[in-house]
Amino acid sequence: MYPKIFVKIPALDDSELTHTIENAIKTSVYPERLVFSICLTYSQSVAREELEAYLDRYANISDFKVTMQTFHPDLLGVAKGRYIAESMYEDEDYVLQIDAHTWFCPEWDERLIKMLNKHDDKTIISGLLPPYEPNGRYPKGKGVYLAEFVEERTYCEWMPNWNPKEVKSDDEFFDNKFSAHFAFGTKEFGKYSGLNRSSFFWSEEPIQDFNLRSKGFKIISPNIPYSLLCHLYTDHIHGEHGKRATISSYLSEEEANYWMNIYDREVYESFFFGESISSL
């Protein structure tokens, strides 16, 4: 009996979801150990139909726990899908948190377990992943990047920004920040993820990072010369390859700005400062 890996994936009309599932199964050493926990929110029936077809194809190989819900504006927010996915955890041995657009290297399951087993139960392997090319699904970078604090605001105007940086070191592992698109831990991570259910988008990672550290978790990355897992970033999507819905796909520009930069800012500032300093 192989140790089980609970793979939690939220998805929002994402064409890469089924490819991610298939890739994880085909590249794992023991696909029978994988327990996929999926929360699919869809506005297009094709997303549901594609997932149902893949469930029929792979349900006799890996285990699946699936929630499918028709889109409603109240379901928007990264934490909502993640919470539903992680709520189906049932004491599996390991937990892998990813996004629905992820690439896996061969033997990824054994590699991650061997890495994690060198540390205590409150260690999480995380960090910023390199990108992959969706047309043909191949990696476009190696290793795991350090999340480096930068003064300039490159993606969010109202909170500290952390940009990817290659690590030049001989150490086997290095300390890092929590990344929501890649985190691997033991049962301890399954019991407590640190997720803030109020987070809409930008506030998710810094709050989850803080919560985990407050509970005694250590967050590290492997210093490796190969592609372990990769993530599909927005600027690598082209045409139908890697196509996925965004917040602006469902909301007006004004509504999207409210949820991303007013509501979520209040969540962030209220958490870290006790009140929203932007409204003082």
Region locations from a protein language model:
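Short, acidic, metal-binding catalytic loop of nucleotide-sugar glycosyltransferases
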Residues: N23-R33
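A conserved hydrophobic helix/loop-capping motif in glycosyltransferases and polysaccharide synthases
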Residues: I5-D14, T27, C39-T41
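Conserved catalytic core of nucleotide-sugar-dependent glycosyltransferases
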Residues: H72-D74, A79-R82, E86-S87, Y94-I98, ...
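A short, charged/proline- and glycine-enriched loop
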Residues: M1-F6, I61-F64
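Eukaryotic intrinsically disordered and solvent-exposed regulatory patches
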Residues: I21-I25, A53-Y54, K80-A85, D170, ...
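Active-site-proximal specificity loops/subdomain of glycosyltransferases
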Residues: V46-D93
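C-terminal catalytic/acceptor-binding lobe
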Residues: P134, G141-F149, R153-T154, M159-S179, ...
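A conserved acidic beta->alpha catalytic loop
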Residues: L17, Y30-P31, I38-A53
